[in-house]
């Protein structure tokens, strides 16, 4: 099936020339190109057109999960008839296994897996193995971490056809071999159940299940069903069932792996004993023999990824298989916000190796654990045959690798200009910020505020919320799907101000935001260098009333460079608009479009806490609230009631109860006045 781009827009501004140049580069087999596009210039739409014209399977690599979710939503809208998948780390919480030699402290691995994201990861690998070429996978840098051998995954696929002859027990055994569990109670993803001649199986990567009805040893019918009710959706001629886990292996491979593990265990024990390190020898023998016994009994063990080299048939030091190995050889790599993503990829290997060296050295793991790792940067480059680096501020690496093949996209299709920048002193900055926020709220716009520290973000959020400004705070500890939900609510107007530290820079599509406030803009460092400032300024570039305020007592070199570059682009854009008679307009997305772009958030149905609670009720306990007049307090009660009603409507009764208690506490303050 071919890619079929669906959009009500046509390429305009710099887009047609950019698309033409990039497509020509791909067709010439140029190994690398750079798309230097300003915020809001439609870089994602440009890349969608390149994918449409080149018809290549594409991996879109993003540096954070929030941006990956947004890109996933946009590509789903552009290509509704094609396969668009999402592949990020599935850990809500992850504490890696580690050993601290100085204190003798061993830390067990601890983790919490997000089942919805695990489903999406399996869906991505299953789609890649389906043979279709019309596939886009949006991934975070977790895609360079080791996963199962794609050949083992492919060999484990179960294919059934209506009328096929197969023994029922053999069919059930084939499900068990690819890590599906038989159940008589809860029918969940990755399980199957048997009732007489009827077998129901719930794929680990889907939201629907299948019913296989047997007549003796013949597959009489295959039906797609609703998992919860068993209601038939449609009749199927065939069923292709992919494994329930990325680390799947056949029985022969398992037995062969155990044999090699035992050989390496013997060598490691002998090495420790020669060095008279008997404690380490005893530890590695006990731990490894326990793992081997688990593998023999269950087919897997805790930490089985540390033995992945044996299952994959790799030599020591040989790179692991990763998501990229599931792609065809001629795939196209798009590195979004490459100035941040590339350094992330560089850093992955070193941090992983340092931790595992101690585990091997002190007898907690065999040396094979060192080969369960992310790719080195050289390995990543070796399998990255054709790349397009996308950034408003490309770094030296991308510019050098592309050998000057830089495609500029400065003109926005909407005619929008880079925002005006104002510098204000830090004296009375909070009062000034509050005035600016109120002005923007009256216009129906949203506001982003970026601070240098988490503590300042917390305090500012509490203050703004306390004086009646609907504010949320986003930070690195907020779960991935919750972040997407927060951004969705900002865009839909559930609240007006979003405060953050380092999550409000690259790539976020927020046309409703007309004001970006940068606190402590003159504090040179990672969060206030030229690239960071240009990216942060860009958050206000999708709105015709875009404005940036830098609160600073001096103009640093980074500030000046960011202001100069923004002014250069703004002048180019103004000249283009005057030449073509274009009036800048904000492209406000409809509610349906916003819901579609943030669709991945719908996977998450759990309670959300955006501001860390410090006692109940949070607002009424704030001393600022006690100083407000009755009119302001009444407004806060009305707002709390609306929030309570909304929470109750969403069946979020814990949150509804919190708002109810807040209302009662605020009413007590009014009564006491």
UniProtKB/Swiss-Prot annotation:
Residue span, Helicase C-terminal domain: 429-591
One of the record's GO cellular component terms: excinuclease repair complex
UniProt-listed GO biological process terms: nucleotide-excision repair; SOS response
Nucleotide-binding in keyword set: yes
PROSITE patterns: HELICASE_ATP_BIND_1 (PS51192), HELICASE_CTER (PS51194), UVR (PS50151)
Compartments in which it is found: Cytoplasm
Pfam family, one: Helicase_C
Xref: SUPFAM superfamilies: C-terminal UvrC-binding domain of UvrB, P-loop containing nucleoside triphosphate hydrolases
Domain UVR: 634-669
Keyword annotations: ATP-binding, Cytoplasm, DNA damage, DNA excision, DNA repair, Excision nuclease, Helicase, Hydrolase, Nucleotide-binding, SOS response
Main location: cytoplasm
Signal sequence residues: none
Domain (Helicase ATP-binding): residue spans on this chain: 24-182
Membrane-spanning intervals of the chain: none
InterPro entries, per database record: Helicase/UvrB_N (IPR006935), Helicase_ATP-bd (IPR014001), Helicase_C-like (IPR001650), P-loop_NTPase (IPR027417), UVR_dom (IPR001943), UVR_dom_sf (IPR036876), UvrB (IPR004807), UvrB_inter (IPR041471)
One GO MF term attached to the UniProt entry: DNA binding
UniProt short sequence motif Beta-hairpin, positions renumbered to this chain: 90-113
Similarity comment: Belongs to the UvrB family.
Domain note: The beta-hairpin motif is involved in DNA binding.
Quaternary data: Forms a heterotetramer with UvrA during the search for lesions. Interacts with UvrC in an incision complex.
Function, as annotated: The UvrABC repair system catalyzes the recognition and processing of DNA lesions. A damage recognition complex composed of 2 UvrA and 2 UvrB subunits scans DNA for abnormalities. Upon binding of the UvrA(2)B(2) complex to a putative damaged site, the DNA wraps around one UvrB monomer. DNA wrap is dependent on ATP binding by UvrB and probably causes local melting of the DNA helix, facilitating insertion of UvrB beta-hairpin between the DNA strands. Then UvrB probes one DNA strand for the presence of a lesion.
Name the UniProt record assigns to this protein: UvrABC system protein B
Gene source species: Cytophaga hutchinsonii (strain ATCC 33406 / DSM 1761 / CIP 103989 / NBRC 15051 / NCIMB 9469 / D465)
């Amino acid at each position: 099936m071919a890619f079929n781009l669906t959009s009500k827009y046509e390429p305009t501004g710099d887009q047609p020339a950019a698309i033409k140049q990039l497509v020509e580069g791909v067709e010439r087999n140029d190994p690398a190109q750079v798309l230097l596009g300003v915020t809001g210039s439609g870089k994602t739409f440009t890349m969608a057109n390149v994918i449409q014209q080149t018809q290549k399977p594409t991996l879109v690599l993003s540096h954070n999960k929030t941006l990956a979710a947004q890109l996933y939503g946009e590509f789903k809208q552009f290509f509704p008839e094609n396969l668009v998948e999402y592949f990020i780390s599935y850990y809500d919480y992850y504490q890696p296994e580690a050993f601290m030699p100085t204190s003798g402290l061993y830390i067990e691995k601890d983790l919490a897996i997000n089942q919805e994201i695990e489903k999406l990861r399996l869906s991505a690998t299953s789609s890649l193995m389906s043979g279709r070429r019309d596939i886009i996978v949006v991934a975070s840098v977790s895609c360079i971490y080791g996963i199962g051998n794609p050949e083992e995954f492919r060999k484990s696929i179960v294919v059934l056809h209506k009328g096929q002859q197969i023994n029922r027990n053999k069919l059930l055994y084939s499900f068990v071999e690819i890590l599906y569990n038989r159940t008589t109670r809860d029918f969940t993803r990755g399980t199957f159940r048997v009732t007489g001649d009827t077998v129901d199986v719930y794929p680990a990567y889907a939201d629907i299940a299948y019913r296989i009805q047997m007549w003796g040893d013949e597959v009489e019918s295959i039906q797609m069903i609703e998992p919860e009710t068993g209601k038939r959706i449609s009749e199927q001629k065939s069923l292709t069932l992919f494994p329930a886990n990325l680390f799947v292996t056949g029985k022969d491979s398992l037995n062969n792996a155990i044999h090699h593990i035992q050989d390496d265990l013997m060598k490691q024990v002998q090495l420790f004993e020669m060095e008279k390190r008997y404690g380490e020898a005893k530890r590695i023998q006990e731990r490894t023999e326990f793992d081997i016994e688990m593998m023999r009994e269950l087919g897997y063990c805790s930490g089985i990824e540390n033995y992945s080299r044996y299952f994959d048939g790799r030599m020591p030091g040989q790179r692991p298989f990763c998501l990229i190995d599931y792609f065809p050889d001629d795939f196209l790599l798009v590195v979004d916000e490459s100035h941040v993503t590339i350094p992330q990829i560089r850093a992955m290997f070193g941090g992983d190796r340092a931790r595992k060296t101690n585990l091997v050295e002190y007898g907690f793991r065999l040396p094979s654990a060192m080969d369960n790792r992310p790719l080195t940067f050289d390995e990543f480059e070796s399998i990255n045959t054709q790349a397009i680096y996308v950034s408003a501020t490309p770094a030296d690496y991308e510019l050098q690798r592309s050998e000057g093949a830089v495609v500029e996209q400065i003109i926005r299709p909407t005619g929008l200009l880079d925002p005006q920048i104002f510098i204000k002193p830090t004296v009375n900055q909070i009062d000034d910020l509050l005035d600016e926020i109120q002005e923007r709220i009256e216009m129906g716009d949203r506001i982003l505020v970026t601070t240098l520290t988490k503590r300042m973000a917390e305090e500012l959020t509490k203050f703004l919320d306390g004086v009646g400004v609907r504010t949320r705070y986003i930070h690195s500890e907020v779960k991935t799907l919750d972040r997407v939900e927060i951004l969705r609510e900002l865009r839909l107007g559930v609240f007006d101000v979003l405060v953050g530290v380092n999550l409000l820079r690259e790539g976020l599509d927020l046309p409703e935001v007309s004001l970006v406030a940068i606190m402590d803009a003159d504090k040179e460092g990672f969060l206030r260098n030229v690239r960071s400032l240009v990216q942060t300024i860009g958050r206000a570039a999708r709105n015709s009333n875009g404005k940036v305020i830098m609160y600073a007592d001096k103009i640093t070199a980074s500030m000046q460079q960011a202001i100069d570059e923004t002014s250069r682009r703004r002048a180019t854009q103004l000249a283009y608009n005057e030449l073509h008679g274009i009036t800048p307009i904000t492209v406000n997305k409809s509610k349906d479009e916003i819901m579609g772009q943030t669709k991945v958030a719908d996977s998450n149905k759990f309670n959300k806490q955006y501001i860390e609670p410090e006692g109940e009720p949070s607002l009424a306990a704030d001393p600022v609230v006690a100083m407000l007049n009755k009119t302001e307090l009444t407004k806060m009660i009305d707002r709390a009631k609306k929030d309570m009603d909304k929470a109750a409507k969403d069946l979020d009764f814990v949150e509804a109860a919190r708002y109810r208690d807040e209302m009662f506490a605020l009413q007590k303050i009014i009564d006491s006045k």
